[in-house]
């Protein structure tokens, strides 16, 4: 089979034998690709450093029976170094990469919108012009949109009644009206849902004037919604330092599990986003 080229983000890698690595790539035209990079662990490797996680590359691959083989790599962006040099940026970017791999799904199923979104989000985290926690939540919301899981934030998720609506239920699909509200719904302040809508729409002017409490509660809802659809916990999300989010997500899961009949108020968030 012929060689092929594509643009890719390096999602992760692990050792293979004494000198090789297997790399997971989110490519623009070929979706999720796993490939062997031969000899990259040797000090004289031609492109070992270019295949580190977060790298945005132009890669040439040779199709293989089980795994493709990396034959050439050129760096496109140099934002990986800015990410790994700061712990906060690093943890946010790790959560993005794990989410991208989960949403990409099957290998070789092209999702060009997810590739573009991931590159733009990593670049935004690296340059630091916007709060990295907001960039992460915007990425998670839009990635869910790519997958078809975006939460309803204005109209009712069940009957499409015009909103805004105060109640929010993860399993129901987001905001729900008073007639459709299931037991276990939470009632965040309207500013929390407004913030989530601003992040999804790219309205940074309004997103960046949000309060720390609203940011904390919004991140809890975003994380709970994403992990409910993935049907698994993301290993990297707990590493992101955002006070209050874990408590919010835990309370939401408990409300859903116990089927509380009364509306539940979100707990007050700790100071700081």
Curated annotation (Swiss-Prot):
Keywords: DNA damage, DNA recombination, DNA repair. Pfam families: RecO_C, RecO_N. Belongs to the RecO family. GO terms for biological process: DNA recombination; double-strand break repair. This is DNA repair protein RecO. The keyword Iron-sulfur does not apply. One of its GO terms (cellular component) is bacterial nucleoid. The keyword Calcium does not apply. Involved in DNA repair and RecF pathway recombination. It comes from Mycolicibacterium gilvum (strain PYR-GCK). Gene3D superfamilies: Nucleic acid-binding proteins, Recombination protein O, C-terminal domain.
């Amino acid at each position: 089979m012929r060689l092929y080229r594509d643009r890719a983000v390096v999602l992760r890698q692990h050792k293979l034998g004494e000198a090789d690595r297997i790399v997971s790539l989110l490519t623009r035209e070929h979706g999720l690709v796993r490939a062997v990079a031969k000899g990259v662990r040797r000090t004289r490797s031609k492109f070992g450093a270019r295949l580190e996680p977060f790298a945005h590359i132009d890669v040439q691959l040779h199709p293989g029976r089980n795994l493709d083989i990396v034959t050439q790599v050129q760096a496109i962006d140099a934002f990986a170094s800015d990410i790994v040099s700061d712990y906060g940026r690093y943890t946010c970017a790790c959560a993005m990469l794990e989410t991208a791999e989960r949403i990409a799904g099957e290998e070789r199923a092209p999702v060009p919108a997810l590739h573009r979104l991931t590159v733009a989000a990593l670049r935004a985290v690296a340059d630091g012009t916007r709060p990295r926690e907001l960039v992460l939540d915007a990425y998670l919301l839009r990635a869910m949109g790519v997958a078809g899981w975006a939460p309803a934030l204005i109209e009712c998720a069940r009957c499409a009644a015009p909103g805004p609506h105060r109640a929010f239920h993860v399993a129901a699909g987001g905001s729900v009206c008073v007639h459709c509200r299931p037991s276990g719904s939470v009632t965040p302040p309207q500013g929390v849902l407004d913030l989530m809508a601003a992040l999804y729409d790219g309205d940074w002017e309004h997103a960046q004037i949000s309060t720390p409490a609203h940011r904390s509660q919004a991140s809890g809802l975003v994380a709970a919604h994403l992990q409910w659809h993935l049907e698994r916990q993301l290993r990297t999300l707990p590493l992101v330092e955002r006070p209050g989010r874990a408590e919010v997500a835990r309370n939401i899961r408990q409300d859903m599990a116990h089927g509380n009949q009364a509306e539940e108020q979100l707990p007050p968030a700790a100071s700081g986003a």
